[in-house]
Amino acid sequence: MTVIGTPLSPVRTRIMLLGSGELGKEVAIEAMRLGAEVVAVDRYAGAPAMQVAHRSHVISMLDADALRRLIAEERPDFVVPEIEAIATDVLEELESDSLTVVPTARAARLTMNREGIRRLAAEELGLRTSPYRFAQTEDEYRRAVEELGMPCVVKPVMSSSGKGQSVVRSADDIADAWTYAQSGGRAGGGRVIVESFVDFDYEITLLTVRHCNGTSFCEPIGHRQEDGDYRQSWQPQPMSAAALEQARHMAQAVTQALGGYGLFGVELFIKGDTVWFSEVSPRPHDTGLVTIASQNLSEFALHVRAVLGLPVPVIRQYGPAASSVILAEGSSARTRFGNLQEALGEPDTSLLLFGKPEVQGRRRMGVALALGETVEQAVEKACRVSDAVKVML
């Protein structure tokens, strides 16, 4: 039986978020709705989840000693990683000493780099993936490109949001793709994955939640990417019954192998009735922001229910819905948003402004959400709303 204590009391149920961006903010809000005490952690002050949490701390989560000390100080009931850049060896060590890591410390370790999860999916579970090679040096990388052929995709094994990712379409791209991958990795360079290009019709995120009563799936989410980062997402993504069955089989296999309770964002490529596994995140997914508008339980509510050992009786999808990203580009610590009256003038629309404290370069600062009669109408409406928001730096 799940028992939730009172925040800021000796009987509190404490959740520590490792990573406090816009996804962590929504997790914090859902956790607080269910009476949990939330401690938000990130590498910079004023991160979105810190703005709503009971307490916050600023540390490098890759600093094993600092992370170990903070967990010992706060004594959380649950540690919930919201990003990949974490000293996962500390989580594995403390999990063996009874700390609850969501979904598991092993899942956090395997998914923090593309090599761990690709080897699990392709080599251990036998899931269909694109042909791939790993390379540590430029010579190994060039051999991998030669073996796989062009076009191929090059990514750092440790990166997110499309950083360091590019497509090699001709021999002229080979050197630049290596250099770009070295600059985009979280560890400052090193190992890359080279993948054959999959000629897919579309790609989806299949949100999969492991909870006390089993495994549940959300309706598939389609999305459009630019420079490796999502710009619009929509739900439901139309797909054949055969493809959906394969997608759910793959999602169940990989999430079962990772174990634990929580929501997973499983990324898949689809061509006709054929499905390829791409990646998985053991946490809410940015493309899943659309579920705030499209479902009775958003991906964040589902994640928190699963973490706390609460049931998920049903996931209701309300019909065509979409999200569209609000981007800022430049340099500022005084970002403001205008023209909101016009942006929110259409029925069945809403905005999330994340509250990120500064912009350096290009940064996702919010998202527009919309419902429509069709997916196409919902996407168009969400884009109109996001385009109407004036970002002032």
Swiss-Prot record:
InterPro entries: ATP-grasp, ATP-grasp_carboxylate-amine, ATP_grasp_subdomain_1, PreATP-grasp_dom_sf, PurT, PurT/PurK_preATP-grasp, PurT_C. Pathway: Purine metabolism; IMP biosynthesis via de novo pathway; N(2)-formyl-N(1)-(5-phospho-D-ribosyl)glycinamide from N(1)-(5-phospho-D-ribosyl)glycinamide (formate route): step 1/1. The keyword Nucleotide-binding applies. GO terms for molecular function: ATP binding; magnesium ion binding; phosphoribosylglycinamide formyltransferase 2 activity; phosphoribosylglycinamide formyltransferase activity. GO terms for cellular component: cytosol. It comes from the Bacteria. One of its GO terms (biological process) is 'de novo' IMP biosynthetic process. Residues 119-308 form the ATP-grasp domain. ATP binds at R114, K155, S160, S161, G162, K163, G164, Q165, E195, S196, F197, V198, E203. The keyword rRNA-binding does not apply. Keywords: ATP-binding, Ligase, Magnesium, Metal-binding, Nucleotide-binding, Purine biosynthesis. Its EC number is 6.3.1.21. It is an enzyme of class 6 (ligase). Mg(2+) binds at E267, E279. It catalyses: N(1)-(5-phospho-beta-D-ribosyl)glycinamide + formate + ATP = N(2)-formyl-N(1)-(5-phospho-beta-D-ribosyl)glycinamide + ADP + phosphate + H(+). N(1)-(5-phospho-beta-D-ribosyl)glycinamide binds at E22, L23, E82, D286, K356, R363, R364. PANTHER family: FORMATE-DEPENDENT PHOSPHORIBOSYLGLYCINAMIDE FORMYLTRANSFERASE. Involved in the de novo purine biosynthesis. Catalyzes the transfer of formate to 5-phospho-ribosyl-glycinamide (GAR), producing 5-phospho-ribosyl-N-formylglycinamide (FGAR). Formate is provided by PurU via hydrolysis of 10-formyl-tetrahydrofolate. Belongs to the PurK/PurT family. Homodimer. This is Formate-dependent phosphoribosylglycinamide formyltransferase.
